[in-house]
Amino acid sequence: MKRIDGRAYDELRPIKIIPGYQSFAEGSALIKLGKTHVLCSVTAEERVPSFLKGSGAGWITAEYAMLPRATVTRTRRDSTLGRVGGRNQEIQRLIGRSLRAVADLDALGERTLMVDCDVLQADGGTRTAAISGAYIALYMAMETLQNMGVISSIPLKSAVAATSIGIVNGSMMMDLCYDEDAQAGVDFNVVMTS
């Protein structure tokens, strides 16, 4: 079976990352993974969740959303539903956990880094693109905080990135586009550190 876009089974789509895409965020990156485009930005807040108050440790959390016309047919915004949908909630938890796994939260100090991942265009792999782009934006935000003298060093223990693996018509493939993902009998995400 030939892949839809002619790639080898173990080949990623072309990746382009534009760091510093937004002017006002402490860190940001636009990641383009083939036709999937995700804007990731980080905001530093001088507060932590109540369970961390007085601990000296920081927190990293994420929000994930898809613009209504990021897809072929319009999807409704979570705000019109009055709640975060189950899929988006699962994805934002995965992004947050992936980033916390590589961060030294004690060295971050009592502050929260809020990572926003907004899908501008979706062609499969939005959550994996969001994780990879969010890491770049997070690194840039930490670099900004270090340059401002807020933190003494960049509190990251490792890099993190993600991709998908799936089986489509009996063939194992890496980095599925939407059409492949829709046909996959099995698919899963791989999140790895450096």
Segments from the language model and where they lie:
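Polyanion-binding surfaces on beta-sheet-dominated domains and ring/shell assemblies
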Residues: 1-194
